[in-house]
């Protein structure tokens, strides 16, 4: 439900093609996905970057392969596939906030409140005046930087962080294999999309371990 409500807020982004945001860097990621489609499944070499370099040295693979797979499967232009990918995981991330708060507090009301806050506002605007002034009609910062500046990979990595933390919390609490596996997959998804997101996860993780509930004894 949280995912669907968030999708309603950003519905135009799911079908967007080329935007008029000239400060955006998203054309780089769209071009990468198009290059990957034309040289599927692995180009090995990218002649257009740094006077030529290995394709896997350029950027984490998650967004490029995700965009390429959507374009190939749905017949979308790479630009539309890119926006679908980033919009989907933006909504996924808001649902992830709900999951993290629900797991940590056991409160459905608190989880809904935090998810709504993440979707509708940015507390940083209270303290960071330049960011507040840069935001169109106080659009949430995470959505603004994705649309205006093309930070799709960064925001996708950020979307996976609450999922990774929620399942890590459950893994520390229960020691069961399922949450451990889901936590590992979510952490891998963070790193696979953006290294800044991976850095944020590395900062949050010790805090999570410090605040995680006492481990339950393992059942015989």
Task: Show which residues each predicted segment covers.
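Alpha-helical hydrophobic membrane-insertion segments
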Residues: 10, 14, 177-181, 203-206
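Short hydrophobic alpha-helices at membrane interfaces in multi-pass membrane enzymes
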Residues: 167-188, 217-220
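Perimembrane helix-loop-helix junctions
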Residues: 200-220
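Hydrophobic residues in alpha-helical segments
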Residues: 36-40, 171-172, 210-217
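Alpha-helical transmembrane segments
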Residues: 1-9, 185
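Membrane-interfacial segments
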Residues: 104-109, 172-176, 214
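Active-site lumenal/periplasmic loops and adjacent helix-entry segments of GT-C-fold
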Residues: 8-167, 189-199
């Amino acid at each position: 439900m949280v995912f669907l409500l968030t999708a309603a807020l950003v519905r135009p982004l799911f079908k967007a093609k080329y935007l008029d945001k000239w400060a955006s860097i998203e054309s780089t990621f769209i071009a990468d996905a198009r290059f990957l489609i034309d040289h599927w499944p692995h180009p090995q070499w990218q002649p257009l970057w740094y006077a030529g370099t290995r394709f896997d040295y350029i950027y984490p693979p998650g967004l490029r392969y995700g965009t390429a797979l959507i374009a190939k499967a749905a017949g979308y232009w790479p630009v539309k596939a890119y926006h679908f990918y980033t919009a989907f995981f933006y909504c996924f991330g808001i649902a992830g906030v709900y999951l993290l708060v629900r797991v940590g507090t056991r409160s459905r009301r608190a989880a809904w409140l935090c998810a709504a806050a993440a979707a509708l506002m940015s507390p940083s605007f209270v303290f960071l005046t330049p960011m507040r002034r840069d935001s169109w009609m106080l659009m949430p910062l995470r959505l603004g930087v994705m649309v205006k500046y093309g930070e799709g990979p960064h925001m996708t990595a950020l979307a996976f962080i609450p999922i990774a933390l929620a399942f890590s919390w459950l893994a520390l609490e229960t020691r069961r294999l399922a949450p451990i596996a889901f936590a590992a997959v979510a952490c891998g998804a963070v790193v696979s999309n953006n290294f800044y997101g991976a850095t944020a996860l590395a900062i949050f993780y010790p805090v999570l371990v410090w605040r995680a509930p006492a481990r339950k004894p393992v059942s015989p």
